From Swiss-Prot:
EC number: 3.4.23.-, 2.7.7.49, 3.1.26.13, 3.1.13.2
Family label: Belongs to the retroviral Pol polyprotein family.
MF (Gene Ontology): aspartic-type endopeptidase activity; DNA binding; exoribonuclease H activity; RNA stem-loop binding; RNA-directed DNA polymerase activity; RNA-DNA hybrid ribonuclease activity; zinc ion binding
Biological processes, Gene Ontology terms: DNA integration; DNA recombination; establishment of integrated proviral latency; proteolysis; symbiont entry into host cell; viral genome integration into host DNA
Zinc finger (Integrase-type) stretch: 832-873
Biased composition (Basic residues): 16-29
Further information: This protein may be synthesized as a Gag-Pol polyprotein.
Annotated ranges, domain Reverse transcriptase: 191-380
Entry keyword Nuclease: yes
Ranges where the RNase H type-1 domain occurs: 575-697
Protein name: Pol polyprotein
Length: 1109
């Protein structure tokens, strides 16, 4: 056994180290070969050419023991009996479990130091070793990684241009936390992972610590500022490996790299930026400063540097072992093979030896040898794979906070690749209030949906990929989602997944989107192009492609008879048999109107609230409701015409009117859709336009009955049982609204049947412009109470023709209109502005106040316009962010913000609220300085405030600001309120941009439209927009500069000082400081004093000229 162990030592790095010494003879000390890099970062060490042996006295005997950091116990072959026997002990060794004698309180002596320790007597041991138990007592450390021959490659990292590193002060910490940090830091310094920072390294990053459940402290570092200033690296690995892409193997081993980050050295020139400070309790001593020598936890580039390093280290080894399936993600390594178990283990051992040369270890206790093996959240079995957690938590009826619901859904979503079921009702619950503590109501439908997923997770298993077989992907329409399954054999899925429905995409378009995602997944995981199975018929898909409804098809595809929920193509751009319905709708006259005229002579019209687009769609909806199974539709709305031809499925349409239209349309046999331009003299189109434009007698509600032609009035119906006390008057509102013609007025009169019982109608005149609810005022003249039952005809409505005559003046002629000095106002003037306001709102989506001020309509009418806008309902303007900010004319704030996948640079003038924004490629200093020149050329600013971002704080930026004469200040670090004005501008711009983006192809155009809406269309309390205020202030400044220049000049005067009884002689040439009707201030040249002189005692003269010498 001894010979076998010595042979192992010779085969490893120690023998290579000896050979290397021979090769390097004669070289200058400290010189490396070209291309060499530094080794793993460790504490100071000495190099030995063989396993280190030391002399230790055990009891009364001197022994030669081997240092072995891999051994827990100190082992000797025999012992003379000193100390206390502690019975038998079982040890786990390479050859299995062995048993030895344990002795406590044995005296040990090493280098003159004596300690009491524990030993194990094992006669059959091939070598006597000093284990970690007693090495710790003597403070002995040995790091085998320092004996490596190969060097870890270094990845260069740097700060962004113009950045100087973080200078964030350390916040106070409790004494308990400082003690915990001191213990952690001392250990890291001993292990060589931290170094003491020199005084001229001024960067600082805050540290703190938390106590783990075990009671130990864990150090945390706030690298946010350093991460912000550090140049990014590309990601070496773009995603997690998936078990569905693994091939089935007989043997697997899962390995974990120990201390992965702490083994890789940090690029030396960068280390000074990682400094941090350990405070001294009560400031009893100076603070201690440290820096990182290795990759720190929490630093944004640690994963990338680690991945690049491992890729470079393992590349050669992987190429030398093509017979295995090898996978690595961060510090987890997967090795699978079909080799014999002995050969498989040899390869694993070879890998451990290989990476040990670089200082990495693969701890034995973290190895998983064989199935089942846990890897990256998955559980691998010989034939199938599962998730490590097989069960989802329960979901019960009742209330749940949004925060808890999000966590539950998160548990499910990442398991979709094995469940493959959609949860539309649960996802719907997450809409609405974004407050994490807001509550949601769980009902039976949600519980059933969740339980179906739980059951599927417990039953479902994934399979492994076979490289010799084709891969298939089958798509199907699920519950408001596209579900697909990837397999090689029927009934044995590799994985499944769900693509939730995408708004405003047809069913075929959604299926193709899911097919693209499926294809991408298969290519990434298996390297093969899958054969896609689409639901439906091949001729349908080929027609969709020809029509241009879809633009991409998989390379290999076919169809299967699946449930597609694909709507029949019954909406066409051709004339079909059946009547033709000419539809129109819009704000034609004060209120919205819609209707249609049929080629058979039928007509329909009604009043309804809504925008022009909504009323156009409602007219089509009414025509479809009342039309036959085969019919033609003609509209002058291009928007409605194109929508109908798209033939979307109602379940994916966001607009409720559009969804209702498609639901009705898909039940018809055939519909021919046609478009004609409006107001072009086309007879039928002009007829329907005129028909709905007329003011017609229209009612809303069921509180009135039709009348016969010979009847005088319309009977009104009592809405509910009403009791009127004797001698009392009661106002009874009924379910009725009227829209009278211009030439009509109405009167509510008493029915004779009610008058006979002593109940009369009082007053009741209805003007032609009135459109509110009808109320009937009843008087009971009896001495007893009267009960009017529900549904009783209790009054009548009589229509009258309106007549209007001018009242001639009495005496002197005067002009006046009711509403200025009369009694009340008719409101006839602002009503005409409502259609204009609505039209303008559909373009720019102003708020109610802006519409109210610009179009001079009532605030309530403006609010109705905004509330009826579908776009404004979805995108509410954000609440105001409060904060102390400097405001002033020509003083600006600037900051970057992210909108979807683009970056915006936003400027805001703090006095007027004027916003200027541009799309930028990134947050680099150079691009920011280019945008500064654009901004300066447009607005001529005086001062600017920004945060401490690298682009703003860079030295070239500061020099540019000085050159332009712009006073530049930065906000308070870690205090978002110092940038409150621009932060609010971000939210306002994003909410406005969301409204305009669907209307434009280019996002730059949407940004420009949003700025018009914010700066020009948005009105303040005095009816002025931000642009109005900005231009006014600029003009005021220009006028002041032009006309007040003389007031700044020095003027001269003679003056006199009045005293009691006489006048004193005047002084000549005092400097003049102020002028006006009030007293003036002058400076006497002789006395150098300032005096206050009445204006009448001063005589102003031109400035004196200097005499020539």
């Amino acid at each position: 056994t001894r010979n076998h162990m010595s042979q192992l030592w010779k085969e490893r790095t120690y023998a290579k180290r000896m050979q290397r010494k021979e090769r390097h003879k004669g070289k200058t000390a400290g010189k490396r070969e070209e291309g060499d890099t530094c080794g793993a970062v460790r504490s100071s060490y000495g190099i030995t050419s063989a396993p280190p042996m030391v002399q230790v006295r055990i009891g009364s005997q001197q022994r030669n023991l081997l240092f072995d950091t891999g051994a827990d116990r100190t082992i000797v072959r025999w012992h003379e009996g000193s100390g206390n026997p502690a019975g038998r002990i079982k040890l786990q060794g390479i050859g299995g479990i062995v048993e030895g004698e344990k002795w406590n309180n044995v005296e040990l002596e090493y280098k003159g130091e004596t300690r009491k320790g524990t030993i194990v007597v094992l006669p059959q041991s091939p070598v006597e070793v000093l284990g970690r138990d007693n090495m710790a007592r003597f403070g002995i450390k040995i790091i085998m990684a320092n004996l490596e021959e190969k060097r870890i490659p270094i990845t260069k990292v740097k700060l962004k241009e113009g950045c100087t590193g973080p200078h964030v002060p350390q916040w106070p910490l409790t004494e308990e936390k400082l003690k915990g940090l001191t213990e952690i830091i001392d250990k890291l310094v001993e292990e060589g992972k931290l170094g003491k920072a020199p005084p001229h390294w001024t960067c600082n990053t805050p540290i703190f610590c938390i106590k783990k459940k075990s009671g130990k402290w864990r150090m945390l570092i706030d690298f946010r500022e350093l991460n912000k200033q550090t140049e990014d690296l590309t990601e070496a690995q773009l995603g997690l490996p998936h078990p569905g892409g693994l091939q089935k193997k007989k043997h697997v081993t899962i390995l974990d790299i120990g201390d992965a980050y702490f083994t890789i050295p940090l690029y030396e020139p960068y280390r000074e930026y990682t400094c941090f400070t350990l405070l001294s309790p009560n400031n009893l001593g100076p603070c201690k400063r440290y820096y990182w020598k290795v990759l720190p936890q929490g630093w944004k580039l640690s994963p990338s540097v680690y991945q690049f390093t491992m890729q470079e280290i393992l590349e050669d080894w992987i190429q030398q072992h093509p017979e295995i399936q090898f996978g690595i993600y961060m510090d987890d390594i997967y090795i699978g093979s079909d080799l014999e178990i002995k050969k498989h283990r040899e390869i694993v051992k070879d890998l451990a030896n290989y990476i040990a040369q670089y200082g990495f270890t693969l701890p034995e206790e973290k190895r998983q040898k064989g199935y089942p093996a846990k890897w990256l959240g998955f559980e691998l079995h010989p034939q199938t794979w599962k998730f490590q957690k097989h069960t989802l938590p329960e979901l019960t009826k009742g209330t749940i906070t949004l925060n808890k619901l999000q966590k539950l859904v998160g548990e499910l979503v990442w398991r979709q690749s094995i469940i493959g079921k959609s949860i539309p009702n649960i996802l719907k619950l997450m809409e609405g209030d974004r407050e994490l503590q807001s509550e949601r109501k769980i009902e039976e439908v949600h519980v059933k949906e969740w339980e179906a997923c739980r059951k599927k997770l417990e039953e479902m298993e994934g399979n492994y990929y076979n490289k010799d077989k084709d891969v298939y992907g089958q798509l199907a329409w699920g519950d408001k989602a596209i579900e697909y399954i990837v397999y090689q054999e029927k009934g044995k899925p590799l994985w499944v997944n769900v693509v939730h429905n995408i708004k405003n995409l047809s069913i075929p378009q959604q299926v193709i989107k899911a097919a693209q995602k499926l294809t991408q997944e298969v290519i990434i995981r298996t390297g093969k192009i899958p054969w896609i199975l689409l639901p439906g018929k091949e001729e349908d898909w080929r027609l969709e492609l020809q029509l241009g409804n879809i633009t991409w098809m998989p390379k290999f595809w076919s169809c299967y008879r699946g449930h597609t929920r694909w709507r029949k193509r019954n909406i066409i751009e051709e004339v079909v048999e059946g009547p033709t319905y000419y539809t129109d709708g819009g704000k034609k006259n004060k209120v919205g109107s819609l209707g249609f005229i049929v080629s058979t002579g039928e007509k329909f019209r009604k009043h309804e609230e809504g925008t022009n687009q909504q009323l156009e769609l409602r007219a089509i909806e009414e025509a479809l409701k009342q039309g036959p199974q085969t019919m033609n539709l003609v509209t002058d709305s291009r928007y409605a015409f194109e929508f109908l031809l798209r033939n979307w499925d109602e379940e994916v349409i966001k607009n409720p009117i559009q969804a209702r239209i498609m639901e009705i349309a898909h039940k018809k046999d055939r519909i021919g859709v046609h478009w004609v331009p409006g107001h072009k003299g086309i007879p039928q189109n002009e007829e329907i336009d005129k028909y709905i434009s007329e003011i017609f007698l229209a009612k809303e509600g069921e509180g009135i009955l039709p009348k016969r032609e010979e009847d005088a009035g319309y009977d009104l119906i009592c809405p509910e049982e009403v009791t009127i006390e004797p001698g009392q008057v009661k106002c009874i509102p009924i379910e009725l609204r009227l829209n009278l013609k211009k030439s009509q007025w109405a009167m509510i009169a008493t029915k004779s049947s009610m008058a006979a019982k002593g109940v009369f109608t009082q007053g009741g005149i209805i003007d032609s412009g009135y459109q509110g609810q009808i109320q009937v005022i009843m008087y009971n003249s009896n001495k007893i109470a009267v009960v009017i039952p529900q549904g009783r005809k209790f009054a009548q409505l009589i229509l009258m023709d309106k007549k209007h005559g001018k009242l001639e003046p009495w005496g002197e002629s005067r002009k006046t209109e009711r509403g200025e000095k009369g009694f009340g106002s008719t409101g006839m003037y602002w009503i005409e502005n409502i259609p204009l306001a609505e039209e303008d709102h559909t373009k720019w989506h102003q708020d109610a106040r802006s519409l109210h001020l610009e179009f001079e309509i009532p605030r309530t009418a403006a609010e109705d316009i905004v509330n009826q806008c579908e776009i404004c309902k979805e995108a509410r303007t954000p609440a105001v962010i409060r904060g102390g900010n400097k405001r002033g004319v020509n003083h600006w704030q600037v900051d970057y913000t992210h909108y979807e996948n683009i970056i915006l640079l936003v400027w805001v003038e703090t006095n007027s609220g004027l916003i200027y924004a541009e799309k930028v490629k990134g947050e680099s200093g150079q691009e920011f300085r280019i945008k500064v020149m654009h901004w300066y050329a447009l607005f001529g600013p005086e001062s600017l405030q920004s945060d401490n971002g690298p682009a703003f704080a860079a030295e070239p930026t500061q020099l540019l600001m000085q050159y332009l004469g712009v006073k530049h200040t930065t906000g308070i670090p870690w205090n978002p309120q110092s940038q409150a004005i621009v932060e609010r501008a971000h939210q306002l711009l994003k909410s406005t941009l969301k409204k305009f983006q669907p209307q434009f192809v280019a996002v730059e155009s949407a940004i420009a439209a949003a700025l018009v809406a914010i700066n020009i269309k948005r009105k303040g309390g005095l009816g002025t927009s931000p642009m109005d205020i900005f231009i006014y202030n600029k003009e005021q400044k220009r006028i002041n500069n032009k006309y007040n220049k003389n007031s700044q000049k020095i003027q001269f005067c003679y003056y006199r000082i009045r005293k009691r009884g006489h006048q004193e002689s005047g002084k000549d040439q005092p400097r003049y400081c102020g002028k006006g009707k009030e007293p003036i201030v002058v400076k006497d040249i002789e006395s150098e004093k300032y005096l206050v002189i009445p204006y009448k005692d001063a005589k102003f003269i031109p400035p004196p000229t200097k005499e020539k010498e």
